[in-house]
Every structure is written in structure tokens, then in C-alpha cells.
Regions:
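Short, small-residue-biased leader/transition segments that mark boundaries at the very start
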Residues: 1-5, 141
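Cytosolic ends of transmembrane helices, especially the final helix of ABC transmembrane type-1 domains
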Residues: 6-30
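Primarily ABC-family ATPase nucleotide-binding module
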Residues: 31-83, 162, 235-236
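Short beta-strand immediately N-terminal to the Walker A/P-loop
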Residues: 83-84, 132
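The feature captures the beta-strand-to-loop junction immediately N-terminal to the Walker
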Residues: 86-88
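Helix-to-loop junction immediately C-terminal to a conserved catalytic motif
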Residues: 101
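Conserved ABC transporter NBD signature motif
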Residues: 109-116, 126
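ABC-family ATPase nucleotide-binding domain "signature/switch" substructure
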Residues: 130-131, 136, 144-147, 163-167, ...
Length: 267
């Protein structure tokens, strides 16, 4: 019994140390990041039109003492093309997507959008032409309309409805107690995981992005909803970068990039 107790305590201690290590990795990601430089705001890309995206010799590591998540990675995405990033867990798919959309700064290399270095035009301006739907994204306490528009003053009601239709959730919204003014969140109506994902997609589309980044953004949807959304977004001719595991999601892309095939270049 004593040996069993000691073994159990050692396992608990190991798990605590492992969790502390993970927290330290995330903290170092913040500490070692340089402050962003903002330039005067301007829309760099045309609304709802595809942008050419080039990744040149891209490398990323959490801090100077850790192994690179990926190194010397190169990729070219044509305007309006959809790319699926695939590979086993831990290969760097989400990290690569976050670097491409400007949420993480690369250790080295370049992200070029329509022949413009995203850091030279200013990340604030780059983000004006992009939208992201990430796994950790959430909705906020407020109306459905507010959540789709990002709580924008003088929101475009017609655009809100259009984005909801493209996200295949308009009909469900109209069946709710107050339609688009239905409150959700802590004090409002509870919604399903699939409804949440579709509202997050609608919120991204409201930004009229030229590039749309999606990380497992349709993982809770049935095939019918997923197919309808993919077809609707494809009709916009915007550039899409998708991280996915589901075969149906991967099959919707124009091209598949398997990061595990890059060996040390994307591991």
C-alpha cells in the first residue's frame, strides 16, 4: 500500500509539472513577442475578393530555447484558392495558421499578401482584410445580431442576414423568440455547439474578408450544414486556409497540404 501511495503521488507530481511546463510555454509565447507596430488604418485588399498569399522560409519557435515548431516552410496560395492544412496532432497546423493570419509573429521568414509584406503594411491593416474562426473563439453576452456584427455601431442589418444565410443559420434564428434580437450568453438563450460555430462563421463573413482562416470551424456540424456553408463561401471567391481532420472538410478544399510530409520543415 505504501509503495502504491508513493507511486500515485509521483504520478500526480509529474502531471502537475507537465501542466506547469505547458503554462510556461504559453507564457513565454507572450513574453518573447515584440509589441505590434500600428500604421494608419486603411483597407489594403478589395472586399470579398481573393488575395494571393505567399509563405517564404517561415520558421516559428515559442522561445529561443525551444525546438522550432516548423522551419523554412514555403507555400504559395493563389487568389480565391482554398487550402486544407492536414496532419497528425502536434505537427504545427494551428500554429502555422496563426502565424499566417498575423496572430503569432514568426521567428524568421515572410508572409506576403498580394506582394505586400504583412508586417510592413501593418498587422492592423492586414487584419482589416482577413477574418479568423479559431477553436478557442467564443460568443459574447448580447443579441445574435450584435454577435454577428461584432457589436459594431450602426451595424448593417442586411449584411447580418446575408452572413447568417451563408452560414446556414438564418432559418433557425428566425424560429428563436426574438429572431436576430434574441439574447445569448450567460443570461440569454443557450445554443448548441453547431449553432455557435455557424454564428462564428457569420461573424467572420461580416468582416468581408479577402482571406478567411478556419481552424476546425465546422467540426460540430452535420454534413448537410457543412456542405451548404462550404458551397456558399466558395461562391465568394475569397482565399481560404483551413485546418481540418474531417474527410468531408478536407475534400472541400482545392488543395491539401500534409504538414507531416515536410519532415523537419513542418514538425
Amino acid at each position: 500500500p505504501y509503495t502504491t501511495l508513493v507511486r500515485s503521488n509521483l504520478i500526480d507530481l509529474f502531471m502537475q509539472l507537465r501542466m506547469l511546463s505547458l503554462h510556461n510555454e504559453r507564457l513565454s509565447e507572450i513574453v518573447f513577442s515584440e509589441p505590434e507596430k500600428e500604421l494608419p488604418a486603411r483597407r489594403v485588399f478589395d472586399e470579398n475578393s481573393g488575395v494571393k498569399l505567399e509563405i517564404k522560409n517561415l520558421s516559428y519557435q515559442y522561445d529561443p530555447f525551444s525546438q522550432p515548431i516548423f522551419s523554412n516552410f514555403n507555400l504559395q496560395v493563389e487568389p480565391g484558392e482554398s487550402i486544407a492544412l492536414v496532419g497528425p496532432s502536434g505537427v504545427g497546423k494551428t500554429t502555422l495558421l496563426k502565424v499566417m493570419c498575423g496572430l503569432l509573429s514568426p521567428t524568421s521568414g515572410e508572409v506576403i499578401a498580394d506582394n505586400l509584406d504583412i508586417y510592413k503594411i501593418g498587422l492592423n491593416n492586414y487584419r482589416l482584410g482577413t477574418a479568423c474562426v479559431l477553436q478557442e473563439d467564443r460568443l459574447f453576452s448580447g443579441s445574435i445580431s450584435d454577435n454577428i456584427s461584432g457589436f459594431e455601431d450602426n451595424a448593417d442589418e442586411e449584411l447580418i442576414v446575408e452572413c447568417a444565410r451563408r452560414s446556414n443559420i438564418h432559418d433557425e434564428i428566425m424560429k428563436m423568440p426574438m429572431g436576430y434580437e434574441t439574447m445569448i450568453g450567460e443570461l440569454g438563450l443557450g445554443i448548441s455547439g453547431g449553432q455557435k460555430q455557424r454564428l462564428l462563421i457569420a461573424r467572420a463573413l461580416y468582416r468581408k474578408p479577402s482571406i478567411l482562416f478556419m481552424d476546425e470551424a465546422t467540426s460540430h456540424l452535420d454534413l448537410k450544414n457543412e456542405s451548404a456553408i462550404n458551397q456558399s463561401i466558395a461562391s465568394l471567391s475569397i482565399t481560404r486556409i483551413i485546418v481540418a481532420h474531417r474527410p468531408s472538410t478536407i475534400a472541400s478544399a482545392d488543395r491539401i497540404i500534409d504538414l507531416s510530409q515536410y519532415g523537419k520543415q513542418a514538425s
